[in-house]
Amino acid sequence: MPVRIIGMIGVTPPSSDATLHVIEGGLSPNYLTAFARAHDEAGFDLALVGYSSSSAEGFLVALYAAMQTQRLGFLVAHRPGFVAPTLMARKIATFDHLTGGRLAVHIVTGKTDDEQHGDGDFSPKAERYRRAAEYLELMQLAWSNERPFDFTGEFYSVQGASSDVRPLQKPHPLLFFGGASAGALAMGAKWCDVYAIYGEPLASTRERIAAFRGQAAAFGRKPGFNVSLRPIIAATEGAAWDKANRILAAMTGKKGWSRQEEATGPVDNAGKRLMSFALEADVHDERLWMPIARATGALGNTSCLVGTPEQVANAMLEYYRLGVDSFLIRGFDPLNDAIEFGRELIPRIKSGALEMDGLRAAQ
């Protein structure tokens, strides 16, 4: 199976040398162009465009970036609940055609209630997952029905709904999702194509893949799996560990980070899982390094792989061996790291995956 490499683009330059998140305020078209082109030239297959209740609108960001690039696809984060699902179905289909099929969608329900409140949604999280499942069902009905249809559900009802535009990709662009709660897994097993998880130890990842495959099989589905990691690479292993410790020092030296975040801890189930591994040990499986996850309260993609490019690529291929077919990778110096990953890491991952596929086929 071909391996998919995903990056993440932001719209403004980072505010420090060691950046945890790329979603910041403002909007710089020049920086967005440079960032997207760097991913395009580096060999990334997709670039995630994140979502927050205060950031630039993701689909417009992705459409602009698509106009500045040649082949890069875009994984656009989208929160159900703020747009009618039939309208969103047409929006996704339109985007897919205008970009020549360079779209995937990451379904997010909102990490915190405060984030949802900022856009006027006061629904509890369990309800948001049920709403998202119904939303996805209605979107897929809009894509698949050639005649007007009716739908009555808990959250949405339509009469005579139809769409004159359907996605270029068949049956539709890939739908990603993440989360570790029962609601997230129930939604994703039935309606999504790729389960996105944070970088956990190999044994835990193997268990999660097996469990979710079983859950999706009940609906006749064979999902893909994405693991999110922060590679920290250097010419020698010692230099890579020195670099990792410098990044940690920069992170923990920031006002508002470190002990406060570690004390409060993550609020979502996926973050709680990540924090449990970070508290268990600094290093798992030789290269999976967790102190940044611990120091920042496991806020998002904070598990790292540390080593030379060859060592980190080999570590990632161990996840590929388990059935992970895509990786979201980004560094702490977002633009420069994307360039370095394209030069040193991505070719090794892709060639290693092809070699592994060849060995499997020969058996």
What function would you assign to each model-found segment?
Residues 3-9, 47-49, 73-78, 103-107, ...:
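Hydrophobic faces of well-ordered beta-strands that scaffold small-molecule active sites
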Residues 39, 43, 65, 95, ...:
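Conserved, mostly hydrophobic/aromatic
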Residues 81-97:
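Glycine-rich anion/phosphate-binding loops
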Residues 24-38, 91, 178-187, 305-319:
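Short, acidic/polar
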Residues 2-12, 111, 119, 125-169, ...:
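An alpha-helical appendage that flanks or caps ligand/catalytic pockets
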Residues 58-79, 131-135, 217-221, 341-358:
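Alpha-helix-loop-beta-strand connector modules within alpha/beta enzyme cores
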Residues 46-65, 199-204, 329-342:
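Glycine-rich, proline-tolerant flexible connector loops at the mouths of alpha/beta enzymes
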Residues 1-71, 168-173:
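N-terminal beta1-alpha1-beta2 module of alpha/beta enzyme domains
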